[in-house]
């Protein structure tokens, strides 16, 4: 089973992402274990390389998603990180 971390400070967006994941599971007859985190700091405190995919908001209180991703990459070069944002100016930076 693939493990997904949803790191998003907005409850509404977290709920939407869970809905999309459940829909994908049904359409593809697969299963994911999705775990929500409200802050990047909370996620970083427990992350030890045990997620396959990280859905990461960029604008959050405390450590932002870009800085969190840099810290994650120091521990885990293989995990898939997908940034979630509605701010276009972050689009290019997310690929660095």
Where are these regions (language model features)?
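Short, glycine/serine-rich, charged loops/turns that create anion-binding
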Residues: 11, 41, 88
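Short, hydrophobic beta-strand segments that form beta-sheet elements in well-ordered domains
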Residues: 35-37, 83-84
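Two-component/phosphorelay signaling modules centered on CheY-like receiver
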Residues: 11-35
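Non-catalytic signal-transmission and effector/linker regions of two-component phosphorelay proteins
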Residues: 1-3
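CheY-like receiver
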Residues: 45, 51-96
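Conserved acidic carboxylate
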Residues: 8
């Amino acid at each position: 089973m693939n493990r997904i971390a949803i790191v998003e400070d907005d409850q509404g967006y977290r709920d939407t992402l869970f809905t999309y994941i459940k829909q994908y599971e049904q359409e593809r007859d697969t299963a994911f274990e999705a775990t929500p985190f409200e802050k990047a700091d909370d996620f970083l405190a427990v992350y030890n390389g045990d997620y396959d995919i990280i859905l990461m908001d960029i604008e959050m209180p405390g450590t932002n998603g870009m800085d969190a991703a840099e810290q994650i990459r120091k521990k885990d070069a293989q995990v898939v990180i997908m940034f979630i944002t509605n701010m276009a100016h972050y689009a290019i930076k997310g690929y660095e």
